[in-house]
Design a protein with these regions (language model features):
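Hydrophobic residues within membrane-embedded alpha-helical segments of Major Facilitator Superfamily
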Residues: 24-27, 31, 38, 58, ...
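Juxtamembrane helix-entry segments on the extracytoplasmic side of multipass membrane proteins
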Residues: 17-22, 45-53, 76-82, 154-176, ...
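Specific transmembrane alpha-helical segments of multi-pass solute transporters/efflux pumps
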Residues: 31, 35-36, 64-115, 151, ...
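Transmembrane alpha-helical segments that form core, pore/gating elements
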Residues: 37-40, 49, 60-63, 122-124, ...
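Hydrophobic transmembrane alpha-helices of multi-pass small-molecule transport proteins
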Residues: 57, 63, 117, 125, ...
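Helix-helix packing/entry segments at the starts of transmembrane helices
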Residues: 52-54, 92, 96, 108-117, ...
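C-terminal-most transmembrane helix of multi-pass membrane proteins
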Residues: 2-14, 55-57, 65, 154-155, ...
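Membrane-helix interface residues
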Residues: 46, 106, 132-134, 189, ...
């Protein structure tokens, strides 16, 4: 009786942990998705590099306080400078910089869909860099993703010349971030320390470039702009990182990656509601193709990792 009750209690705790994990993922996806129209509105008052860099540095300060409160060390190990610089360039400077720049030329919904093709680019880049050939399922996913991009811009017919810099910026963000997932090994730092240091190293040059090239007017920020700035600092780069790490403690990484496919969906819908951006048959078809394609890509990757783990386990047992 005791064994049954203890097993039931463990199952109950497992279900509860998974429920909390999925709730954390929904908060993460919603926070990141809503940030797309928020950034688009903020760019009417502050230029992209300066705005995103300032928000990143403010978020780094908040995360540093969180790390201190939970007892995480912020000390950098010796010899980590080069790895940290490369990681910060790909994961923060290129990702946040090009993402925000893209919104100067394309809509928030278009930017969200283009940027979140990064798993597809990671799959393509892993082939020449590590010799990992895509599985057939993943190839189907790649075709669907690129079909979705073409659909989004009407097969290229609806792509205006003035949108091209935005499309290239969004794709640069996706490709460089994907490159970072392949060539940059995890930093030997605690989670919040790793994010904080990357934000600092990546956002300082962003602010410097913004001051030198964009000449921002600090007093141009309205009350609404300040509220959006606070949201961009606290929610996507603060709360969402907290909920993301909380979800990873309760759910497998593959599951977490799949659920975050909600982010571009939420971004497109939020942009349609808040900014009146188009949300018709073409946008819906592009969403289905891109998100469906990414689901194929991620499932193919998780299956390959699972088979690799099983093979290593069999080898271990045979030794």
């Amino acid at each position: 009786m005791t064994d049954r009750s203890s097993q039931g209690g463990e199952r109950g705790r497992g279900v509860s942990a998974r429920a909390v994990g999925f709730l954390c993922l929904f908060v993460t996806s919603a926070g990141w998705g809503i940030n797309w129209p928020a950034m688009k509105v903020l760019l009417r008052e502050w230029p992209p590099l300066f705005a995103r860099g300032v928000a990143g540095l403010a978020a780094a300060a908040i995360l540093a306080v969180v790390a201190w409160r939970i007892g995480e060390s912020m000390r950098l190990p010796a010899g980590i400078g080069r790895r940290l610089t490369v990681a910060a360039f790909l994961n923060v400077f290129a990702w946040m910089g090009f993402t925000t720049l893209s919104l100067t030329w394309v809509s928030a919904g278009q930017g969200a869909l283009l940027v979140y093709t990064m798993p597809a680019w990671a799959l393509l880049l892993a082939w020449p860099i590590h010799g990992r050939r895509p599985e057939p399922r993943a190839v189907v996913g790649l075709v669907l993703c690129f079909a979705g991009i073409l659909t989004l811009f009407g097969g290229g017919i609806a792509l205006r010349v003035d949108q091209l810099p935005g499309v290239l910026s969004a794709l640069a963000a996706a490709i460089l971030f994907a490159l970072g997932t392949i060539v940059v090994a995890p930093l030997p730092l605690a989670p919040f320390a790793a994010v904080t240091w990357q934000l600092v190293v990546g956002c300082v040059p962003m602010v410097a470039l913004g001051l030198a090239l964009e000449h921002p007017r600090i007093d141009a920020l309205s009350t609404r702009g300040a509220a959006l700035m606070a949201y961009m600092t606290i929610v996507p780069m603060g709360v969402c990182y907290l909920t993301w790490f909380a979800a990873l403690r309760r759910l497998p990484g593959e599951v977490a990656s799949m659920v975050t496919l909600l982010t571009p969906l939420i971004g497109v819908i939020a942009a349609a509601i808040a900014l009146g951006e188009p949300l018709g048959a073409r946008q819906a078809a592009a969403l289905v193709l891109v998100i469906g394609g990414l689901a194929f890509v991620l499932r193919g990757q998780s299956k390959k990792r699972r088979l690799g783990s099983e093979e290593r386990a069999r080898r271990g047992r045979s030794v």
